[in-house]
Every structure is written in C-alpha cells, then in structure tokens.
Curated annotation (Swiss-Prot):
Lineage: Eukaryota, Viridiplantae, Streptophyta, Embryophyta, Tracheophyta
Family recorded in the similarity comment: Belongs to the protease inhibitor I3 (leguminous Kunitz-type inhibitor) family.
Disulfide bonds: 40-86
GO molecular function, one term: serine-type endopeptidase inhibitor activity
Function field: Inhibition of trypsin.
Alphabetized InterPro entries for the sequence: Kunitz_inhibitor_STI-like_sf, Prot_inh_Kunz-lg
Protein name: Kunitz-type trypsin inhibitor alpha chain
Signal peptide (from-to): none
Top-level division of the source organism's lineage: Eukaryota
Length: 137
C-alpha cells in the first residue's frame, strides 16, 4: 500500500510536506510555538487558522528507499524557507519529550528521543504515531 499526499502523489523518502488536519475547520497545519517558559519556539503545535499550512516538514526513513510506506520508521524535521534566529544553528528534527509527552524540536546536543514516528492509515486518511523504543511495533 502506498501513502499519498493531498494531491494524490506518492510520499517520497526525504520529501517536503505540509502536515494538515484530515478535517477542515479544525485548525491549520503544524508549526512551532513557545510553551512553558521557552525562549525560542520549540514545541510542535497546530496552527489556529485553517488557512495557515504551518511549516514544511521533511519526512524520511533511514533506509535509502524511494517511497515511504505505512509502518516505516520515520524521522520528521521542519524545513522552513527562512528559519528564525532561534533556529538557524539547531536541528528542527522532532522528538518526544518524556516528561510532558509533547513533540519538541531537539537541540543538536540532545539527539536522544528522535523519532521514530510512523504514518498509519486511519479511516480514509492517515495519522502520525510515535513509537517509543520500548513499545511493540
């Protein structure tokens, strides 16, 4: 089974995509925001406006394959065209913070906790799932 983007194109390993909600009227795409005393926006959140596509995200699987399929272990990293001063020197790769269970942007010194994420079919759409190393896959 192949994963398709909103244009019906196959998801390419390393491709850049906007991650949008399945249903309109429920907010926009995913972006970064400051939470809990952060000096730079490091938390992945959904944009409030449904017209805001959020930030483009690169989605890739470590194996060198052309197409992303359901259940593949994936890394996700924001790739803004014009990164803010806060993000010019840091990775924008996603990780899950253990204490809060929030998706955060990892700083270069803290590579622990990157992914893996998976894309799974859900009804007529897809959902992103975080897979903790300790969980069954």
């Amino acid at each position: 089974q192949e994963l398709l983007d909103v244009d019906g194109e196959i998801l390419r390993n390393g491709g850049s995509y906007y991650i949008l909600p399945a249903f309109r009227g429920k907010g926009g795409g995913l972006e970064l925001a400051k939470t809990e005393g952060e000096t730079c926006p490091l938390t992945v959140v959904q944009a409030r406006s449904e017209t805001d596509r959020g930030l483009p995200a690169s989605i890739w699987s470590p194996p060198r394959i052309a197409i992303i399929r359901p259940g593949f272990s994936l890394n996700i990293e924001f790739r803004p065209r014009n990164p803010s001063a806060c993000h010019r020197e840091s990775s924008l790769q996603w990780k899950v913070e253990e204490e809060s269970q929030q998706v955060k942007i990892a700083v270069k010194e803290d590579a622990r906790g990157f992914g893996p994420f998976r894309i799974r079919p859900h009804r007529d759409d897809y959902k992103l799932v975080y897979c903790d190393e300790g969980q069954k896959r």
